[in-house]
Amino acid sequence: MSPKTETKASVGFKAGVKDYRLTYYTPEYQTKDTDILAAFRVTPQPGVPPEEAGAAVAAESSTGTWTTVWTDGLTSLDRYKGRCYDIEPVAGEESQFIAFVAYPLDLFEEGSVTNLFTSIVGNVFGFKALRALRLEDLRIPPAYSKTFQGPPHGIQVERDKLNKYGRPLLGCTIKPKLGLSAKNYGRAVYECLRGGLDFTKDDENVNSQPFMRWRDRFVFCAEAIYKAQAETGEIKGHYLNATAGTCEEMMKRAVFARELGVPIVMHDYLTGGFTANTSLAHYCRDNGLLLHIHRAMHAVIDRQKNHGMHFRVLAKALRMSGGDHIHGGTVVGKLEGEREITLGFVDLLRDDFIEKDRSRGIYFTQDWVSMPGVLPVASGGIHVWHMPALTEIFGDDSVLQFGGGTLGHPWGNAPGAVANRVALEACVQARNEGRDLAREGNEVIREASKWSPELAAACEIWKEIKFEFEAVDTI
């Protein structure tokens, strides 16, 4: 390099390290309608000012790095950088802050949850200047959400396919989750569907193990579906889990399900990955299959209050990536879920337009425009005594799924399904007549059990079962 070139290269470039807040903390910034907005719960290391911590998050999740680089001069950082535009303390927590960050739309590939998350929840979560970091919420602008297909079909199309209206749908996860042969598994599916359930489900652990290979399970479950449909006159389904070790194998299983003529398949979207999930969702729309989503592994990501990512973000990501159902907690069962927080992300799954409501953990107003909605699935430790509360909490556009609460019935699988269907129909009728399920729910169940021996037996066996632990996920 000549002396002349060296002199020219040094002009306008000052090497070294400077505070992130000098570039990435911009409290005067006015957010744009096209910006992706994020709310991070930030716990800085001792001695790190909140403005520096928030700016570091904005920098490390967009254009910044630990030192000034000369190639910054080859682009417009003001156009592409993330900006921490507001910081507020978290009430009741020492040294925790909510940092609001705005990202320009051009930072992200269209239609890719994978790329979105690689930036926003990528390496920044291991940044040493932060003791902990949690992504509480995202605002997805219509300019970005319209680049996604979203759910394969959505709530209304599913109801039309099933010809079922005016009530929640009923499901059951086949138990034991592992160890049954394909034929015995299919028998349990048939008995539950014949008894009155709309769906049965593969457990998320069920893929293609030595005791039951996937193709055998698919065939016996399809036989069970058609037999139950013929006997009941209702459309039935079983969530055939297409999750596999490779995308190619996953698609092969989905294709076989379509060839069998079944209405719905299933995917574990977090363990399977967003790229695989989006590919499957596109296939399902093109081929008329509904897509049930299980959230296995979510608690590894969202259970800790100060680090990770809240489930409402994972729920938004799923709506964009694609799924017609997703598990979302029960409020009343054995799994984590505080009522207002749960209903907040349930609305984010189902509704077209959701107003900002910090009391429910919703940090931003979200407009999904025309993207179809997703049915929330309540599953985990629920039984007939929970039916009034579930009907009142989740409303008609939901799936209520009773695994042990069906298969644990003392008289067998079909009577367990009958008990749940009777309880649901009684609760829906009582609600439609103007009765208060929150106050009169137990009485509604007792009245129905007088003419349904199956329900009476279920009420007796589960009358003492409760899961009374305080929720971790609170505001």
Swiss-Prot record:
One Gene Ontology molecular-function label: magnesium ion binding
Keywords: Acetylation, Calvin cycle, Carbon dioxide fixation, Chloroplast, Disulfide bond, Lyase, Magnesium, Metal-binding, Methylation, Monooxygenase, Oxidoreductase, Photorespiration, Photosynthesis, Plastid
Residues making up the propeptide: 1-2
A Gene Ontology biological process term: photorespiration
Residues the entry annotates as binding substrate: 123, 173, 177, 295, 327, 379
Cofactor (UniProt): Mg(2+)
GO cellular component: chloroplast
Residue(s) carrying N6,N6,N6-trimethyllysine: 14
Site (Transition state stabilizer) location in chain: 334
Family, similarity comment: Belongs to the RuBisCO large chain family. Type I subfamily.
General function of this protein: RuBisCO catalyzes two reactions: the carboxylation of D-ribulose 1,5-bisphosphate, the primary event in carbon dioxide fixation, as well as the oxidative fragmentation of the pentose substrate in the photorespiration process. Both reactions occur simultaneously and in competition at the same active site.
Further information: The basic functional RuBisCO is composed of a large chain homodimer in a 'head-to-tail' conformation. In form I RuBisCO this homodimer is arranged in a barrel-like tetramer with the small subunits forming a tetrameric 'cap' on each end of the 'barrel'.
Designated name of the protein: Ribulose bisphosphate carboxylase large chain
Protein source organism: Picea abies (Norway spruce)
Lineage: Eukaryota, Viridiplantae, Streptophyta, Embryophyta, Tracheophyta
